[in-house]
A protein has these predicted regions:
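Ferredoxin-type iron-sulfur electron-transfer modules in oxidoreductases and energy-metabolism complexes
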Residues: 1-4, 35, 46-210
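Ubiquitin-like/PB1-type beta-grasp interaction modules and other compact soluble beta-rich domains
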Residues: 5-11
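FAD-binding core of FAD-dependent oxidoreductases
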Residues: 12-16
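Conserved phosphate-handling catalytic cores of large alpha/beta enzymes
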Residues: 19
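Short strand-turn-strand beta-turns centered on an Asx-Gly dipeptide
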Residues: 23-25
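A short, sequence-level motif marking secondary-structure junctions
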Residues: 31-38
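Extracellular interaction modules
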Residues: 39-45
Length: 210
């Protein structure tokens, strides 16, 4: 007697990223995978595997806690002080809005991390903050640094990306952008944040401020 196979799921429409797994060697969301796409002929085999860069909880279900920890490292949120009215936000050009909207589509699925040769399984939680942070967190740091309110934490994010496991640990394999289900320009974000950390380091050296 066998028990049902366990996997994670949520939205069933490719917006939450919970069901991400490796299907016939390719990392993707299982909810949008059609049988006919991978097994068009009778007798074809479909192989399902859990992502290899995260600890397996059971069967196809993995623990993505390290992925979310990386978002905490770069403070991927907009700081809000509710003690006073901030008023209306500044106007943005349609081009800037579109850039940020594209970056905001990240669903923290882990595809980019699974494909990245620099990102490896690390089950020791004490080492997470010194391991490569990953393309998703770098891109989200860019998103919030370009937000008029979010950029209040810009210096903190750049400091984190300048530290061990930050943007300089990227090997430029560009696998991340090839597997991203939302086609987010991850390599552009990595390049942009690499330049930003360099400018930040030079400015900090001369001003003494971080």
């Amino acid at each position: 007697e066998t028990t049902p196979v366990v996997w994670d799921s949520g939205c069933l429409e490719e917006v939450c990223g919970a069901c991400t797994m490796v299907i016939n060697g390719k990392v993707r969301q299982s909810c949008s995978c059609l049988i006919d796409e991978y097994a068009p002929n009778d007798g074809d085999t479909i192989t399902l595997e859990p992502m290899s860069k995260f600890p397996v909880v059971r069967d196809l279900w993995v623990d993505r806690a390290r992925l979310f920890n990386a978002l905490k490292r770069v403070k991927a949120w907009v700081p809000i002080d509710s003690t006073y009215n901030l008023g209306s936000g500044p106007k943005e050009s349609p081009e800037h809005q579109q850039t940020r909207y594209t970056l905001s589509e990240c669903m923290s699925c882990g595809c980019c991390l699974e494909a990245c040769p620099q990102y490896n399984l690390e089950e020791d939680e004490s080492k997470w903050d010194e391991s490569f942070i990953g393309a998703h967190a770098i891109s989200q740091a860019r998103l919030f640094n370009e937000h008029e309110t979010g950029k209040r934490l810009k210096g903190d994010r750049l400091e984190e990306l300048s530290s061990k496991g930050g943007v300089n640990d990227c090997g430029n394999a560009q696998n991340c952008v090839k597997v991203c289900p939302k086609e987010i320009p991850l390599t552009e974000s990595i390049g942009a944040m690499g330049r930003a950390t360099t400018i930040h380091a030079i400015a900090s050296f001369f001003t003494g401020k971080k």
